Regions:
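C-terminal and inter-domain tail/linker signature
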Residues: 1-137
Length: 137
């Protein structure tokens, strides 16, 4: 597959998440997805990715992600993203604040056989917690 095809897979991955169509995730993500621990208590793999997204949707029902930059080389695609939503539900033990948040992240996806097989990501959790008003720095 070409680099442009790899980037197209990552764009599709993000579209599926933004539509909250987790059943469609298997179109672009391997069932055996390798990830580091996504969130405490969440398993790795495609089911863990789905569970982590459900946690975000519980806390932020209007949760969306925008791809700000997309780079690819070989079998890897890197995305710089901005995530946003309004905290109207409980989120990881934090009661709803009603606050709109916007925070950034970056991830690298490795593509094989037309699917994401590995995913590494980092988000600005400090900014998220500051905007929710639960972390003062």
């Amino acid at each position: 597959m070409s680099i442009e095809e790899h980037k197209k897979i990552v764009r599709r991955y993000q579209e599926i998440y933004n539509r909250n169509d987790l059943d469609a995730l298997s179109e672009v993500v391997s069932e055996d997805l390798l990830t580091p621990k996504i969130m405490p208590g969440i398993p790795t793999g495609i089911e863990g990715a789905k569970a982590a997204h459900r946690i975000m949707l519980t806390g932020f029902p209007d949760y969306q992600t925008v791809i700000d930059d997309l780079f690819a080389e070989g079998d890897k695609v890197a995305a710089r993203i901005t995530m946003s939503g309004t905290n109207t539900g409980s989120f990881m033990g934090i009661p709803p604040t009603g606050k709109y948040v916007s925070f950034t992240g970056i991830y690298i996806a490795r593509i094989a056989n037309g699917k994401i097989v590995e995913h590494w990501g980092e988000e600005d959790g400090v900014s998220l917690l500051q905007q929710l008003g639960v972390l003062n720095m």
